[in-house]
Amino acid sequence: AFSILGYYGFEVYREAPPIPQQYVSESGEKVITHDDILHGQTAWQTTGGMQVGSVWGHGAYQAPDWTADWLHRELTNWLDITANQEFGKNFADLNDEQQTLLKARLTKEYRGSKVENGTVVLSNTRLAAMEKTAQYYISLYGDDPATKVTREHFAMKDNTLPNLQARKDLAKFFFWTAWTASAERPNTHASYTNNWPHEPLINNVPTPENVIWSIASVVFLIAGIGFVV
């Protein structure tokens, strides 16, 4: 039993999503470092961590899953930024052909994001989408009146995280969790989180393995209940 636990413990460690040494712009400018992400994780933990929302689906549900929330916000920001740059209007106002074109580019960029020599290169458009997304979280975890009602809905107090730098690092941590949920694990067609959360904008849909294990789990549960009864 201990051997099995040890084996799976090692596998979890080995298969854990990587924390890159740095994220850089196309010109090579350093944007996020490994330490920034760890500082952001610590900042998040000081607010109660998984007692306020969840990350990767683990935590309390009175607030959103921050991974899923960040990912969707960043994707929609990317689409709006690109749509305005190329067509002069928001993504929702484009015709079907234009939307399909942009979604294909979005999917290629996000799912194709990879670590090379400890570094991930981000496009200028993605950086702009990240910055817009980060501002929402910096506002939410502070005392900005613009997000006060949202804080009330999430049972968050004003200045949940009073230090501005801590809020900026928190945003970088949330970004990293979303990056792991969208970037494909090398030599696979699934993200580091096995295509969780569901996000059709970039084809984050359940893998065959997910479906099989979900069915198997239900079967084993019913069988176990039947055995006990």
What are these regions (language model features)?
Residues 1-10, 44, 52, 210-229:
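Hydrophobic cores of alpha-helical transmembrane segments in multi-pass integral membrane proteins
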